[in-house]
């Protein structure tokens, strides 16, 4: 986490005090949660869905939260804090200190012979921090001790796993392990983040406003890795929580069953968890605040640099990645189309970026559809032209219709998928492309279906003297909720036109699909029926498919409808309502039930 720079007293679960530049501890104001911003936190680059689990989350023996080594003092304080949590004892008094920072913003380092093959990658990771902050990483020399007033330095070596101490923890060699499988740019940037004083982002006290921690999916004995701190013991410098921080856990860290251990409260942001591509703007802003990169006496009268920027020795603003302008006031714009959207309208159209033109390489788009509680969502693909692969491994559109936090079915090529129907009121569609070969993409329409399976008293009697069963309805004052089509099931229920008993809308095409248990049939009785009247039902009409392709050979409109019950041929029945551009009426209401024949 970028935030949590350790204190000199007890910190919730883990403590790591950082030393002030002068060597004196510097007390900071009491921390309060930063305000939540209306805009989304952004992370550089297109992120695939989901991110591969970061190597730094793989458990290292003796490490806390996978990749953080603790000093003896920190281990003792951590145990005391855990004991306090378990017993409910009042926390020991602690004051926020931003201590154990590296003095003068200079971090001496050595790269051991065991890591010589990784030296270019390690240097690139340090350059990334230098390019976006005022920190400087310098090869260790004999003069550093005299110039900086300490003997501390980072020592990169090829140890077991990926891990680092937090902040300036020793007055001597401080190791960072870049072991097997850890030699990736983002992983090394992450470990250096720990070394300069960052903790994991999901440890912040305000994390529950942004993420869900799913303890039921966490390995037994690993729950402490998901502990969070309190504002009385940590500081965020008022920088907003960032699910795209390079210091954030991925979605599946320490999973016991292959299911997520962390999800974002906004499902569209799940793909940002665990990114190891680059520092996020919020990472950069916090580092520059913590290390007081803008604290130059000669620039006291200069305008403040914004968005994590800081003044150089000439009092010009140095802007972090993603911003420019004299004061870093301008966000760098991109021509890449925005493709993270949330849909709540009852109907809509979703397309891949640039449709009907070709989508770009390296896209990662997330579309969330959410209806009212109790509703379902139907998604119909009308166009599909995506790079093909038997397992859709290259480019794909994925539909999550049951659990939006679990993998869904992937589609690619030119074959239109079947209609996708959600089991609840949410659906998540992601579209990803690799670095080569593109197509036109996809186009799909959706509709939110308000379920209208209001239960009615079972007062049906089947006559033994007639070939078609009839129904006698109970006289009730039930509330009827109409809809423009939908899927209906169960043993009995009710369907009605949109807005019933008020007039339905113009320009409708509503399809109602009623399906009961295999081996049974659907019986339908109209309670009310008033559509715009016309001799041949050319304007507004209702047609009925009794299943197995059998349709009634007439359209119904006006006030004319079958007086007897309609019975399906198979276990399903389909009703289609059509309205034109003018004149509407009350519509219809009908009850259905499953029967045995």
Swiss-Prot record:
Its main location: cytoplasm. Residues 1-16 form the signal peptide. Its cofactor is Zn(2+). Pfam families: Astacin, CUB. The keyword Nucleus does not apply. Residues 295-329 form the EGF-like domain. One of its GO terms (biological process) is proteolysis. Residues 17-93 form a propeptide. Residues 339-449, 484-595 form the CUB domain. SUPFAM superfamilies: Metalloproteases ('zincins'), catalytic domain, Spermadhesin, CUB domain. GO terms for cellular component: cell cortex; extracellular region; perinuclear region of cytoplasm. It is an enzyme of class 3 (hydrolase). Its EC number is 3.4.24.-. The active site is at 191. Keywords: Cleavage on pair of basic residues, Cytoplasm, Disulfide bond, EGF-like domain, Hydrolase, Metal-binding, Metalloprotease, Protease, Repeat, Secreted, Signal, Zinc, Zymogen. One of its GO terms (molecular function) is metalloendopeptidase activity. Residues 24-67 are annotated as: Disordered. Residues 93-294 form the Peptidase M12A domain. Zn(2+) binds at residues 190, 194, 200. Binds 1 zinc ion per subunit. It is found in: Cytoplasm, Perinuclear region; Cytoplasm, Cell cortex; Secreted, Extracellular space. Disulfide bonds join 134-293, 162-182, 299-315, 305-317, 319-328, 339-365, 392-412, 484-510, 537-557. Could be involved in the differentiation of ectodermal lineages and subsequent patterning of the embryo. This is Blastula protease 10. The lineage of its organism: Eukaryota, Metazoa, Echinodermata, Eleutherozoa, Echinozoa. The gene is BP10.
